[in-house]
Amino acid sequence: MDSTVVLITGCSSGIGLHLAVRLASDRSQSFKVYATLRDLKSQGPLLEAARAQGCPPGSLEILELDVRDSESVAAARACVTEGRVDVLVCNAGRGLFGPLEAHELNAVGAVLDVNVLGTIRMLQAFLPDMKRRHSGRVLVTASVGGLMGLPFHEVYCASKFALEGLCESLAILLPLFGVHVSLIECGAVHTAFHEKLEGGPGGALERADAQTRHLFAHYQRGYEQALSEAQDPEEVTELFLTAMRAPQPALRYFSTNRFLPLARMRTEDPSGSSYVEAMHREAFSDLQVQEGAKAGAQVSGDPDTPPRALICLPECAIPRVTAELGWSASDKPGQNKSCYQQKI
């Protein structure tokens, strides 16, 4: 029987790396994996993991692919010697963290280019053949940040919300062509993402008013204490296999059910008020913003007390609403920089 040909983007670290090695080393030896990276200079950890797991010869091939470049996508597609991709995994992603007004527009555009347009470029390149063959699976690494808005992650959440709409729309159409699309909704995941977050091009915190800067600094302090609750990427990769092997795959698979109560809150109250109030309460309830404060006024409350609860985007730290609803925890965004942006 022919191997299942899988192409995965964003395999330099994290979920992409672990999924590529997990499939290539599977006992069934039924997968041929094309693990793609934006820059082949970053393939060292992937090669090391493949050797450690004993991936059989020919089970894993590493390709250069930059999801921001249609020509790069086409070149990688041409390198697939089987002439087909049975499972496409859109995993490459970029994060941006900080007050919205502090972000450079080119940093905002970079996030949207990778997370949204990059996924669209991959779909445009590989969907036509899947539809012609009446066979194929598309798995997209999604996020709790695509199901609910979170402060200081406005741009990241906007990009992930876009993926939800994109994939849900395709999920209605594609079964007519024998193709299925699934979103793997991740919570907090232990990855190297927080080590890749950087300031500089992400923006200048000084652009934000003093009150917003105070809230942001307060908000960041909860990451360290929340990191311990994050899932391991190996655990999350098994969910991808579940979606790949399901006879009739679902649109969404959740790596944790801890944030589902808030997701339900958004649908049960279409006005959005219940969710907004709950998130505001959990994120900022220990800070009392002075009524009628002038621009630059101080915010009362203990500046050394982190928010009561935090959660994390897959590979990107975000606030969480947990104390009452049981969400999962988060990654730490590395050094104390004003804004953060992930390199891919």
Swiss-Prot record:
Binding of substrate, residues: 143
Record's keyword annotation contains Lipid biosynthesis: yes
Enzyme class: oxidoreductase
UniProt subcellular location: Cytoplasm
Entry keyword annotation includes DNA damage: no
Catalysed reactions, as listed in the record: 17beta-estradiol + NAD(+) = estrone + NADH + H(+); 17beta-estradiol + NADP(+) = estrone + NADPH + H(+)
The protein's name in its UniProt record: Estradiol 17-beta-dehydrogenase 1
Organism: Rattus norvegicus
Gene: Hsd17b1
